Amino acid sequence: MSFVCGGSWKFQSGCLEELTEFAKHQFALNRQHPDGSTERDHLESVERQTGRRPSALDGPPLPYDIAHVWLWFNDLSAARGNNGWGPNALNYQDMAAWMMLTGTIVRPQEISAILMLDRLWMSEQAKATAAARKAKG
């Protein structure tokens, strides 16, 4: 898949790849441990205690040209439903309602990017759930 980068609506794969790498790093930092804390919490605690910033806190930068897609994804994700077994994936109906309520105009390529981010997020949630089950025995 490709995405816009560099202020042009010509699609370039590098920009979406940068967003993907940024998102993977953020999702990994936000992964919850069985005690309810996140990986980010643990690393920031190390930083506070030692005065040294763990390199794992510093990941790829958010690509400026498509930062809005990341913000939109987070906005949609914060309102996602739950089916009793875990979080629901975002869907077109969720996005259509969000666009209508916020007045946001989203291009088809941006919708694809949001759905790609959601697949990554759901995958990270599945890993966290599996780790929690394994920790419980």
Where on the chain are the PLM-derived regions?
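An amphipathic, hydrophobic-aromatic interaction surface with interspersed Lys/Arg
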Residues: 1-137
